[in-house]
Amino acid sequence: MASVINTNDSALLAQNNLTKSKGILGSAIERLSSGLRINSAKDDAAGQAIANRFTANVKGLTQAARNANDGISIAQTTEGALNEINNNLQRIRELTVQSENGSNSKSDLDSIQKEVTQRLEEIDRISTQTQFNGIKVLNGDVTEMKIQVGANDNETIGIKLGKINSEKLNLKEFSVVEKEAVAAKPAVPAQPAVPADPKNGVAAKPAVPAQPEVKAQEAVKKTDNPLDTLDKALAQVDDMRSSLGAVQNRLESTVNNLNNTVNNLSAARSRIEDADYAVEVSNMSRGQILQQAGTSVLAQANQVPQTVLSLLR
């Protein structure tokens, strides 16, 4: 090797290796501080792209699981309302069986019909007012609610909904009594009593009380086969309840599957982008040793040109 002053090959080589060891140490420190093996595309371009797709899927499936839980809540809310409708129908059927007994007076039947009417109005109220997050689920506005249960397009589960009220159940004109039509009559004012007048041959007349106005009433026809009609209504409610129960079970299974998929994808992503601390601590120690050794060697390499001066003495 020639003895030169302008170019110190040994120092340049030591400096180059020192720069490399500095990069190793810096990379190890970055990974240890972030917990990630891939902090930018330069670390692993293909791995970074794969991990990014996994992240998109994990976030989408996590939200899909929340959507499915919302779907379960919708089905539970609707089924709870149908359960109350069922209770009212059961009571109406009980009253109808009671009304079929021949020992009931007209007054008894009227009392039974009043409760039947109130129960039917309650069914209509439940149908009109039952809602989830502002969406009415039993008034017919929504026939099917789609729940997004996947991270991609068209991955949905439909919840069948429908209108359930007295009209839909064929109970709009349901009656356990039969009434004839009544014509309207105007109110009649009271007439004062007329005292007797023997001189003029006028007999006394008692006071006539006022007669209230009689409003017209249409004839009410008793429902034919009322118990069969109610059984069909109950079957209609049961059919919708069973459908909601089935979709609840399906959504619960969907949530479990989504959670398993999220766990597996998260584990796969971790294997790609997360830092192995045992490896990185080893790399950091190696980088530190190389830095210390490189610095020491560079200092010695810088002394090599000094030996040329001895030739000038």
Swiss-Prot record:
It is found in: Secreted; Bacterial flagellum. Residues 255-266 are annotated as: 2 X 5 AA approximate repeats of V-N-N-L-N. Residues 179-217 are annotated as: 2 X 19 AA approximate tandem repeats. GO terms for molecular function: structural molecule activity. InterPro entries: Flagellin, Flagellin_C, Flagellin_C_sub2, Flagellin_N. Its main location: secreted. It comes from the Bacteria. Residues 5-33, 97-117, 252-298 form a coiled coil. Disulfide bonds: none annotated. Residues 190-199 have a biased composition (Low complexity). Pfam families: Flagellin_C, Flagellin_N. Gene3D superfamilies: 6.10.280.190, f41 fragment of flagellin, N-terminal domain (1.20.1330.10), Flagellar export chaperone, C-terminal domain (6.10.10.10). Keywords: Bacterial flagellum, Coiled coil, Repeat, Secreted. GO terms for cellular component: bacterial-type flagellum; extracellular region. Residues 190-211 are annotated as: Disordered. Sequence repeats lie at residues 179-197, 199-217, 255-259, 262-266. PANTHER family: FLAGELLIN. Flagellin is the subunit protein which polymerizes to form the filaments of bacterial flagella. Xenorhabdus strains undergo spontaneous variations involving a large number of phenotypes. Phase 1 variants were motile, whereas phase 2 variants were non-flagellated cells which did not synthesize flagellin. Effectively, the fliC gene is not transcribed in phase 2 variants. Belongs to the bacterial flagellin family. This is Flagellin. It comes from Xenorhabdus nematophila. The lineage of its organism: Bacteria, Pseudomonadati, Pseudomonadota, Gammaproteobacteria, Enterobacterales.
